[in-house]
Amino acid sequence: MSMLFYTLITALLIGIQAAPHTESNVPAGHAIPQAHWIKLQHSLDTVLRRAHSAPAGPIAARVAGQTHNITVDPKLFKKRRLRSPRVLFSTQPPPVAADTQDLDFEAGGASSFNRTHRSKRSSSHPVFHRGEFSVCDSISVWVGDKTTATDIKGKEVMVLGEVNINNSVFKQYFFETKCRDPNPVDSGCRGIDAKHWNSYCTTTHTFVKALTMDGKQAAWRFIRIDTACVCVLSRKTGQRA
């Protein structure tokens, strides 16, 4: 930035010295052509535009080949509005087995960022008491290979797979939940009266903030991910309440 400032000052001084202020103070035969002055002004405008468009905030990042070359300021993850319990930046895959749900990734630690108090996740189903069953069967996993997603405007965007934080490559993970089977039983959802109701299990979605590509810069966007499995009911034709 200092080099750019020095260049601007130098060009400005040259322009001031070369500019003809009046007819009386310019020696005969040494007048600067108007075309040269226009060219100098155009060069200054170009430099100013480049300086104005250069990313300066912590969110902005330049792409230099591969995605892990995108550098992100770790202070960015301390902003509460950018945190999500379903999004994790980590150098290692998060634990997903039931016997590892007591493991935690501390926010700002050596291996992960942007963790919150809701950090314990498991791919296993909730523990039901004897005689209790889930209407739909779901599966939850940490997804670390997401490359594209749909944003809140319905537009397909590119998701950043890796970023550089404190000279370490962190992968972006998403905790997603979806239906294991649309029909856990032959009639549809488990425990539904098939005589009066049609039913099936379907995956629902929500939007979380994630790092995506916006042109040649990294930017936060709300993207859609799978978050739950629910049962959809419809009354069978001819049935009355």
Swiss-Prot record:
GO terms for biological process: cell surface receptor protein tyrosine kinase signaling pathway; modulation of chemical synaptic transmission; negative regulation of neuron apoptotic process; nerve development; nerve growth factor signaling pathway; neuron projection morphogenesis. PROSITE patterns: NGF_1, NGF_2. It holds the Pfam family NGF. Keywords: Cleavage on pair of basic residues, Disulfide bond, Endosome, Glycoprotein, Growth factor, Lipid-binding, Metalloenzyme inhibitor, Metalloprotease inhibitor, Protease inhibitor, Secreted, Signal. Residues 19-121 form a propeptide. One of its GO terms (molecular function) is metalloendopeptidase inhibitor activity. Residues 1-18 form the signal peptide. A 1-acyl-sn-glycero-3-phospho-L-serine binds at K209. Disulfide bonds join C136-C201, C179-C229, C189-C231. A 1-acyl-sn-glycero-3-phospho-(1D-myo-inositol) binds at Y173, K209. GO terms for cellular component: axon; dendrite; endosome lumen; extracellular space; synaptic vesicle. PANTHER family: BETA-NERVE GROWTH FACTOR (PTHR11589:SF10), NERVE GROWTH FACTOR NGF -RELATED (PTHR11589). Homodimer. The homodimer interacts with a single NTRK1 chain. The homodimer interacts with a single NGFR chain. The NGF dimer interacts with a single SORCS2 chain (via extracellular domain). The NGF precursor (proNGF) binds to a receptor complex formed by SORT1 and NGFR, which leads to NGF endocytosis. Both mature NGF and the immature NGF precursor (proNGF) interact with SORCS2 and with the heterodimer formed by SORCS2 and NGFR (via extracellular domains). The NGF precursor (proNGF) has much higher affinity for SORCS2 than mature NGF. Belongs to the NGF-beta family. Nerve growth factor is important for the development and maintenance of the sympathetic and sensory nervous systems. Extracellular ligand for the NTRK1 and NGFR receptors, activates cellular signaling cascades to regulate neuronal proliferation, differentiation and survival. The immature NGF precursor (proNGF) functions as a ligand for the heterodimeric receptor formed by SORCS2 and NGFR, and activates cellular signaling cascades that lead to inactivation of RAC1 and/or RAC2, reorganization of the actin cytoskeleton and neuronal growth cone collapse. This is Beta-nerve growth factor. The lineage of its organism: Eukaryota, Metazoa, Chordata, Craniata, Vertebrata. The gene is NGF.
